[in-house]
């Protein structure tokens, strides 16, 4: 293992100050809230469409909550590694949501959401059922996620840089 890798591993285990942890936790919870609102909108869509969301889709959707849960655990323990999890959460969640909803999902595991929002707006036949309708609320609750997740990612990167610089100025290894 190179010295730079050892230094980075040591840095990632460094304890955060209360203020930095609070800022990151706020952003992490904002991303989590946006994801929850988006999922609630899917329930609203399913009700509108009279569509029964399959159980496997409920289980798959839990994957969205892995990064914010890990980040929350790291933040509660004030670990510098939370910088990476909050930043990754912002990038991964935004990219995944936009890919699935604006383009085509990579896999056909998404039930009625195997179609992008543009096709769903026009209407599609899915498993013998005609599904149509994407309204402004659907769009807002899709686009609000990257609107908060990208600034969260940028804040995590900025705070990491500041935190590391403060360690260097204090004479500690970063």
Question: How should each PLM-predicted stretch be described?
Answer:
Residues 2-31, 161:
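Cytosolic juxtamembrane helix and N-cap/initiation of the first transmembrane helix
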Residues 34-42, 91-114:
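C-terminal TM-helix exit segments that contain a strictly Trp-centered aromatic cap at the helix terminus
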Residues 46-52, 100-137:
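Interfacial non-cytosolic loop connecting adjacent transmembrane helices
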Residues 63-85:
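Canonical alpha-helical transmembrane segments
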Residues 150-171:
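Cytosolic juxtamembrane helix at the C-terminal end of the final transmembrane segment
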């Amino acid at each position: 293992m190179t010295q730079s890798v050892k230094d980075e591993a040591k840095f990632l285990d460094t304890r955060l100050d209360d203020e930095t942890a609070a800022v990151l936790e706020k952003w992490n919870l904002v991303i989590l809230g946006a994801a929850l609102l988006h999922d609630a909108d899917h329930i609203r869509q399913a009700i509108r469409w009279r569509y029964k969301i399959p159980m496997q889709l409920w289980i798959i959707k839990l994957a969205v909550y892995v990064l914010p849960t890990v980040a929350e655990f790291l933040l509660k323990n004030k670990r510098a590694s939370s910088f990476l999890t909050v930043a990754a959460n912002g990038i991964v969640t935004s990219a995944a949501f936009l890919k699935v909803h604006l383009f085509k999902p990579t896999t056909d595991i998404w039930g009625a959401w195997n179609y992008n929002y543009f096709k769903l707006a026009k209407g599609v036949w899915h498993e013998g059922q005609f599904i149509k309708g994407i309204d402004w609320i659907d769009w807002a609750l899709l686009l609000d996620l990257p609107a908060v997740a990208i600034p969260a990612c940028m804040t995590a990167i900025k705070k990491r840089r500041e935190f590391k610089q403060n360690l260097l100025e204090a004479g500690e290894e970063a």
